[in-house]
């Protein structure tokens, strides 16, 4: 968001501090000042009042204006047709500068022009953001300014525009009041615009019937305020397009408080408004979208936010609607409209009721200053922000997190500063500011503590000398490529309906997401591998082996294999090649898996993965999968191997024994094979036959080894 440095300094009472010091403090407070732009390069301009206008007889489109300035009367020629007698203007007079240009008195078409009248564009504002009133010629306004005063100061035109990038979890920061409050706390100056009380002059009779899952608050205001010229300029500095009085007022509340709002006007006999969701269509677009509609008592639309505004009569009472719409719905509307306005952007952020309270508190101050009556808030109760979340205080943990030796005086002084931005402390706990949504853990408080304690107080630490160690190379990609697998990459997010969860992991619900197809953090890599496999099968590729390593729900890191070539037994061997652990395989009981062809993988009695085929309902019966949770496997220490012993070379021929296991259909051979594999010096165990007879599995394995292996097997079976 773009901020005016002049306005921030004015709100926070920082006029005594240099621009650079205030900018540095914003950076120290954790706000990324991405760009600093000077509004203009002008100096020496003056206020003037037009006394008389006459046409230049020697020119078709020039007017001679007699203008009263503080020091004298000057005649200035202009082609602007919107000049009016007794109105005030801004002017470059002889000696004024704009960039490298110095203005002088100059003869034009037979008459001396002692300067130039100024338009909004010449002050540095974007022409495309101006309304017709500001763009019809030079700036003309009512005679309210002292001609002795400096326009650059009074209208805040000697300004720097700061492009401040805010973290996604600080939607409250899109507000002049919140930033000014933090600056005032940092510099220990007074700031009183965020009060703890809200009031009203009367109680509104409006009833809002809300048939949506959104929250709607409102304020009845007796007259539409007209923004001062300096506040119109503030909107332009924020790259907000100037509109009618209602739009300007709503946008001013937005940049000042962070609360989006809309203006709504009812006929006097109407006491009820209904909020519903229904389809809306815009011109030249074939599609429709469900959006919010404010209806009157006759069920006719009064306002469709972001689609159609209501025309507000200036001198009649109206309602300022302050919504907290469903974030998903806002995102859909934003994509449908292909619109990226400041209001829509803020509507899509997770601001809380504290932001609405700040808006109501500021409106109390602003409307009283304008001598405009307003109601008590509609639907808003202070209890919405009085329910505080308390977190335990642990100053030893604070010192450990920050790596600082903090005295009790350091802690007390910093906590006093934090109280100015809304923290509350007692002996053992604290509650965060009522408008913040980012303070959930003690570490969040520690980060705020450091911001106001001072980043510059972090001491340089001498790095401990460590011995260089060459990391072990990662051979997994090479091994997988050698085994014939191709790497894939897929999205971390997946649709709710497709979220395949055989290991019963838990995931966070997302407040915002890119689309309906990407609403949940995936529980498994296998589902996307299955879809990639099916896509390639449709392309007549039948022999497919794929793998992916990536993140899944619960901060887990996973490896998944999918193959139409390899059997489940092959995948077990590949797992052993990749990770030399002694895994156990047990029958899998999961709605997501085929119970007859799937197994869970355990390591030291910890569930670390699954193997086999997905449930038949998914129609992927010819694809075998293996998925292993690497983050769990890595936590289990490897068992150290025994001491290596060398024996004399034995050149005798290897022999084999064929063993057939007869098992029930849901049983698996792994526990029986583990018993056999305990026989020392086995060379290999291979599956050579698998049949089903009378609902029994007949599984034949060939065990190869030297004479003593065959002797042990013969002994075992006897």
From Swiss-Prot:
Taxonomy of origin reads: Bacteria, Bacillati, Mycoplasmatota, Mycoplasmoidales, Metamycoplasmataceae
Give the cofactors, semicolon-separated. Mg(2+)
Q: Which residues form the signal peptide?
A: none
Q: Which gene encodes it?
A: pheT
Give me the residues that bind Mg(2+), please. Answer: 438, 444, 448
Name the record gives this protein: Phenylalanine--tRNA ligase beta subunit
Q: Which PROSITE patterns match?
A: B5, TRBD
Residues in tRNA-binding domain copies: 39-153
The record ties this protein, via InterPro entries, to: aa-tRNA-synth_II/BPL/LPL, DNA-bd_dom_put_sf, NA-bd_OB-fold, Phe-tRNA-ligase_IIc_bsu_bact, PheRS_beta_core, tRNA-bd_dom, tRNA_bind_bactPheRS, tRNA_synthase_B5-dom
Cellular component (GO) terms are:
cytoplasm
What keywords were assigned to this record? Aminoacyl-tRNA synthetase, ATP-binding, Cytoplasm, Ligase, Magnesium, Metal-binding, Nucleotide-binding, Protein biosynthesis, RNA-binding, tRNA-binding
Q: Which GO terms describe its molecular function?
A: ATP binding; magnesium ion binding; phenylalanine-tRNA ligase activity; tRNA binding
- Its source organism is Mesomycoplasma hyopneumoniae (strain J / ATCC 25934 / NCTC 10110)
This entry's Enzyme Commission designation comes to 6.1.1.20
Keyword set includes Transferase: no
Gene Ontology biological process: phenylalanyl-tRNA aminoacylation
Outline the extent of the B5 domain: 386-460
Ribonucleoprotein as a keyword?
no
| Principal cellular location given in the protein's record | cytoplasm
Free-text comment on the cofactor: Binds 2 magnesium ions per tetramer.
> What reaction(s) does this enzyme catalyze?
tRNA(Phe) + L-phenylalanine + ATP = L-phenylalanyl-tRNA(Phe) + AMP + diphosphate + H(+)
* Family label: Belongs to the phenylalanyl-tRNA synthetase beta subunit family. Type 1 subfamily.
Its annotated compartments are: Cytoplasm
What is known about its subunit structure? Answer: Tetramer of two alpha and two beta subunits.
């Amino acid at each position: 968001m773009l901020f005016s440095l002049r306005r921030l300094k004015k709100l926070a009472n920082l006029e005594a501090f240099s621009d650079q010091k205030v900018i540095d403090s914003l950076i120290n407070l954790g706000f990324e000042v991405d760009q600093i732009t000077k509004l203009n390069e002008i100096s020496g301009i003056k206020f003037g009042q037009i006394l008389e206008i006459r046409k230049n007889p020697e020119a078709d489109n020039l007017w001679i204006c007699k203008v009263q300035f503080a020091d004298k009367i000057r005649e200035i020629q202009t082609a602007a047709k919107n000049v009016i007698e007794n109105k005030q203007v801004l002017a470059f007079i002889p000696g004024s500068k704009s960039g490298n240009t110095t203005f002088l008195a100059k003869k034009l078409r037979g008459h001396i022009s002692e300067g130039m009248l100024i338009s909004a564009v010449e002050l540095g504002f974007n022409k495309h953001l101006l309304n017709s009133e500001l763009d019809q010629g030079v700036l003309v306004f009512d005679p309210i300014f002292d001609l002795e005063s400096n326009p650059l100061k009074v209208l805040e035109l000697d300004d720097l525009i700061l492009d401040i990038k805010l973290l996604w979890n600080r939607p409250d920061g899109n507000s002049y009041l919140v930033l000014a409050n933090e600056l005032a706390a940092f510099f220990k100056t007074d700031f009183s615009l965020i009060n703890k009380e809200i009031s009203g002059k009367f109680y509104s009779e409006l009833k809002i019937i809300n048939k949506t899952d959104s929250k709607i608050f409102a304020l009845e205001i007796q007259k539409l305020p007209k923004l001062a010229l300096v506040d119109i300029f503030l909107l332009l500095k924020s790259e907000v397009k100037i509109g009618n009085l209602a739009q300007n007022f709503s946008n001013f509340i937005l940049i000042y408080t962070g609360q989006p709002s809309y203006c709504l006007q009812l006929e006097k006999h109407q006491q009820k408004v209904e909020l519903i969701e229904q389809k809306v269509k815009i011109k030249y677009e074939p599609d429709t979208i469900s959006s919010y509609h404010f209806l009157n008592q006759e069920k006719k639309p009064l306002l469709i936010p972001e689609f159609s505004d209501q025309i507000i009569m200036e001198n009649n009472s109206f309602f300022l609607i302050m919504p907290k719409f469903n974030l998903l719905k806002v995102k859909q509307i934003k994509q449908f409209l292909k619109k990226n306005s400041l209001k829509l952007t803020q509507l899509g952020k997770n601001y809380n009721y504290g932001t609405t309270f700040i808006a109501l508190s500021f409106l109390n101050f602003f409307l009283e200053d304008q001598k405009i009556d307003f109601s008590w808030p509609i639907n808003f109760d202070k209890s919405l922000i009085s329910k505080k979340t308390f977190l335990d205080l642990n100053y030893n943990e604070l010192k450990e997190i920050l790596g600082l030796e903090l005295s009790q005086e350091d802690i007390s002084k910093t906590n006093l500063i934090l109280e100015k931005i809304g923290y509350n402390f007692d002996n053992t706990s604290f509650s965060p500011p009522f408008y913040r949504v980012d303070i959930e853990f003690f570490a969040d408080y520690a980060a705020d503590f450091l911001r106001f304690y001072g980043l510059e107080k972090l001491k340089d630490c001498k790095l401990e000398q460590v011995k260089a160690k060459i990391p072990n190379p990662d051979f997994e990609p090479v091994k997988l490529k050698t085994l014939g697998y191709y790497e894939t990459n897929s999205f971390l997010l997946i649709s709710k309906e497709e979220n395949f969860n055989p290991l019963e992991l838990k995931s966070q619900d997302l407040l915002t997401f890119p689309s309906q197809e990407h609403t949940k953090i995936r529980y498994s890599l296998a589902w996307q591998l299955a879809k990639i496999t099916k896509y390639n099968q449709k392309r007549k590729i039948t022999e497919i082996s794929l793998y992916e390593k990536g993140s899944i729900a619960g901060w887990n890191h996973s490896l998944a294999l999918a193959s139409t070539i390899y059997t489940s037994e092959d995948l077990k061997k590949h797992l052993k090649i990749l990770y030399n652990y002694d895994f156990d395989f047990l029958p899998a009981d999961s709605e997501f898996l085929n119970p007859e062809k799937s197994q869970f993988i355990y390591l030291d009695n910890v569930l670390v993965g699954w193997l086999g085929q997905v449930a038949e309902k998914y129609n992927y019966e010819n694809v075998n999968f293996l998925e292993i949770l690497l983050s769990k496997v890595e936590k289990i220490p490897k068992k150290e191997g025994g001491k290596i012993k060398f024996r004399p070379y034995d050149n005798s021929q290897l022999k084999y024994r064929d063993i057939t296991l007869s098992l029930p259909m849901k049983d698996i051979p792994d526990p029986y094979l583990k018993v056999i594999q305990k026989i020392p010096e086995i060379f290999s165990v291979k599956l050579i036959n698998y049949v089903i007879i009378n609902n029994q599995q007949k599984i034949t394995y060939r065990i190869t080894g030297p004479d003593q292996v065959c002797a042990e097997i013969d002994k075992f079976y006897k």
